[in-house]
Amino acid sequence: KIIGIDLGTTNSXVA
């Protein structure tokens, strides 16, 4: 899941 969308794409892929 792309969680970075909420945090600002920087953390995308974190999971």
From Swiss-Prot:
InterPro entries: Heat_shock_70_CS. Disulfide bonds: none annotated. Signal peptide: none annotated. The keyword ATP-binding applies. It comes from the Bacteria. Induction: By stress conditions e.g. heat shock, and by the herbicide dichlorprop [(R)-2-(2,4-dichlorophenoxy)propionate]. Keywords: ATP-binding, Chaperone, Nucleotide-binding, Stress response. One of its GO terms (molecular function) is ATP binding. Acts as a chaperone. Belongs to the heat shock protein 70 family. This is Chaperone protein DnaK. It comes from Delftia acidovorans. The gene is dnaK.
